[in-house]
Amino acid sequence: MPQVDPDLFDRGQFQAELALKASPIAAFKKAIRRARDVLDNRFRSGRDIRRLIEDRAWFVDNILQQAWDQFEWSEDADIALLAVGGYGRGELHPYSDIDLLILLESDDHEVFREPIERFLTLLWDIGLEVGQSVRSVDECAQEGRADLTVITNLMESRTIAGPEHLRQRMLEVTSTQHMWPSKEFFLAKHAEQKKRHHKYNDTEYNLEPNVKGSPGGLRDIQTILWVARRQYGTLNLHALAGEGFLLGSENALLASSQEFLWKVRYALHMLAGRSEDRLLFDYQVRIAGLLGYEDNDAKLAIERFMQKYYRVVMSIAELSDLIIQHFEEVILSDDDGTPQPINSRFQLHDGYIEATNPNVFRRTPFAMLEIFVLMAQHPEIKGVRADTIRLLREHRHLINDDFRNDIRNTSLFIELFKCEIGIHRNLRRMNRYGILGLYLPEFGHIVGQMQHDLFHIYTVDAHTLNLIKHLRKLQYTEVSEKFPLASKIMARLPKPELIYLAGLYHDIGKGRGGDHSELGAVDAQAFGTRHHLPAWDNRLIVWLVSNHLVMSTTAQRKDLSDPQVIHDFAQFVGDEVHLDYLYVLTVADINATNPTLWNSWRASLLRQLYTETKRALRRGLENPVDREEQIRRTQTAALDILVRSGTDPDDVEQLWSALGDDYFLRHTAGDVAWHSDAILQQPADGGPLVLIKETTQREFEGGTQIFIYAPDQHDFFAVTVAAMDQLNLNIHDARIITSSSQFTLDTYIVLDHEGGSIGNNPERIQDIRDGLTEALRNPDDYPTIIKRRVPRQLKHFAFAPQVTIHNDAQRPVTVLELLAPDRPGLLARIGKIFLEFDLSLQNAKIATLGERVEDVFFITDANNQPLSDPQLCSQLQEAIVKQLSVNSEPGGDLRISI
């Protein structure tokens, strides 16, 4: 800490100002404001961050000493003011906790009660937010023995004012001889760390990470130092290196990583104007700018900054694992035991694998891959011994092109993917220890690569490893219940290693600019060649990487009731083997991207596409189902259901004669029978008919189907979606049919706000039925579009809406594709615009992906014809962009082809 820094705090000048004022508060506040400005300017000008946080601690020391001196304490008073915790370490960020301990010799606090209260009141009056405790030396011992947090704080203390001997006595009575011996302390701190990591999903890669508490954050470094302090009396990283527990390179890496996180935390506090350790979207862009990051052709400044952040915390996590493992071996091991040989290079020691000698990786570099294969083959191995982790770090520079092309290494890498268990766990270890990104440089490129959106909640490497984890979990019984079809297919794949390898490469082309699927396919081709994969295997992997988005896009954006869509997709996949692999990869990809993306309706769409495509492949691509055949088959099956329930076939025929072909193409026989039975029983003046049921009885799949039958009216769709918005229903699919008798038969698939169907909830179902019926009885009383607050996170991903309009080549409709920021009530607003433009909606595919929506609307004009006026299309686009540009960028993108 500085001894003198008059620009930050001039003691003489401050005391002179105190003497001129009746109250000291103004002088203190002025000094605090000035110091904050000085320190912020120093930060912006690039001052060394370690000096900066020490400067702030030094300034607060001086302020506290001056405040302490405002009160009369006798020279021999047994009372002292101590800094504890982070402040005790001499580290203070702009709004860090200022933790104080007022330490007394005696348990009797009464004699000092009044001056202590006045001292603390002064601190609050001058704007210092302090956390304080008042304890005697004996009370410190009692509290420290009972509370891990208290003993941790007391270990880091400095005397600010008063006699030093009180602190020394406190340290003596709270030492390991009296409480918290190093073994007990280590176990408690390690458990505390695991609990903290679990709070942040056990990943360094959260979208809005906590720079202090997340895995790889500042708290992990502090945990290392706390354990070292309790075991060895070591004060800092440099001292820990001096004791031989850290190599010089490891110390340098931890120190530089700590300083980077200090910069981020300092900037966070400065921008937030409060204690804020969450790297929220609100601050990420500005911090990237403060730290000097700029956009380039391939990446935004924020993506470059966050990639640096993720790589830093990954390095900290790696070293933290190593050091904690070392502490565990030293502190907890009661008996070294006799190592059990695995082979000439590795042995098992206390359940952990270790190299048999320090030269293993130098003499046999292939052992750097072999160790992970051995752990996959022997799941009883708990992990890697600390010294062997260190040896891996020291020798990983040997991974070069010769290493990558060595047949022993390529064979070992493929062997890992053929292991029945442990693939994900050991790929994650390889990534943690820096081996995976060196062996596959293309993977190294995506380590820490974020995507600035809410759709992808993990970095590319974390998402990739999560995908492999999901593939592996499909073989677990508890997971197979949620994903029955994917689990069944996964179990019968002829070569499961190929799906794992495709998963490893599916997003590897991201962050370079260009189409990541095409770039990844090139890398996958090179990988297969280098690893001597059979030609068919390699072609399948490359095909999967190149086309890994196609099935998801088809299911969510195409009309799966159209036989031509199924036929085209069946032609695309070509055979059932490709279909099986692509389906499983798609399911795992969606779940590994963002758990909230996988909902029951997406599950149903993918199952439907898979099942219909499989049926088409078995029938033969040369024998596609035509429209007439599908209509005839649906009508025959539906009529059979109705007749068996006692319905008059003549009544059915009369009803169906007005419905048109599209109705029977877009509904199942079961739904047609359900609709027809209810319509035929509906009184002539019964008002709107609203039917509600689940689309499937399969758990974890489907949605809630709402069928509405009523006389057609101009504003029917707009009124319906506005009413559903009021009912807090998320629309995921809309099928709009108008009969020749001018009745509308609309089917909506809805989910609740948690992504599930309404289920067996009679009260909720009745509320929905009543709400829709009332709205449709009084269409002129247009439901108010609820003005809901746009969620905080969505505000930071605004972009200009994009509208594409073109006429369908096969059907007499106009296709309007919308890509826009998500916002509450979006579909209700679109419905109102369609009403204003006198447009009819024939069909809709609704998809919300993170912070954006990708919706497709099939529309016609007032005469049920495709749009033909370019000027009308332009006006429609402008209206949509204007309506949806609130809280997003102005402008918009229009593409019209009519």
Swiss-Prot record:
Uridylyltransferase (UTase) activity is inhibited by glutamine, while glutamine activates uridylyl-removing (UR) activity. Residues 705-788, 815-891 form the ACT domain. Its cofactor is Mg(2+). Its EC number is 2.7.7.59, 3.1.4.-. Gene3D superfamilies: Beta Polymerase, domain 2, cca-adding enzyme, domain 2. The keyword Transcription regulation does not apply. It catalyses: [protein-PII]-L-tyrosine + UTP = [protein-PII]-uridylyl-L-tyrosine + diphosphate; [protein-PII]-uridylyl-L-tyrosine + H2O = [protein-PII]-L-tyrosine + UMP + H(+). Keywords: Hydrolase, Magnesium, Multifunctional enzyme, Nucleotidyltransferase, Repeat, Transferase. GO terms for biological process: regulation of nitrogen utilization. One of its GO terms (molecular function) is phosphoric diester hydrolase activity. Residues 460-582 form the HD domain. Belongs to the GlnD family. The lineage of its organism: Bacteria, Pseudomonadati, Pseudomonadota, Gammaproteobacteria, Pseudomonadales. It comes from the Bacteria. InterPro entries: ACT-like_dom_sf (IPR045865), ACT_dom (IPR002912), HD/PDEase_dom (IPR003607), HD_domain (IPR006674), NT_sf (IPR043519), PII_UdlTrfase/GS_AdlTrfase (IPR013546), Polymerase_NTP_transf_dom (IPR002934), UTase/UR (IPR010043). Modifies, by uridylylation and deuridylylation, the PII regulatory proteins (GlnB and homologs), in response to the nitrogen status of the cell that GlnD senses through the glutamine level. Under low glutamine levels, catalyzes the conversion of the PII proteins and UTP to PII-UMP and PPi, while under higher glutamine levels, GlnD hydrolyzes PII-UMP to PII and UMP (deuridylylation). Thus, controls uridylylation state and activity of the PII proteins, and plays an important role in the regulation of nitrogen assimilation and metabolism. Residues 1-341 are annotated as: Uridylyltransferase. This is Bifunctional uridylyltransferase/uridylyl-removing enzyme. It comes from Pseudomonas syringae pv. tomato (strain ATCC BAA-871 / DC3000). Pfam families: ACT, GlnD_UR_UTase, HD, NTP_transf_2. Residues 342-704 are annotated as: Uridylyl-removing. Has four distinct domains: an N-terminal nucleotidyltransferase (NT) domain responsible for UTase activity, a central HD domain that encodes UR activity, and two C-terminal ACT domains that seem to have a role in glutamine sensing.
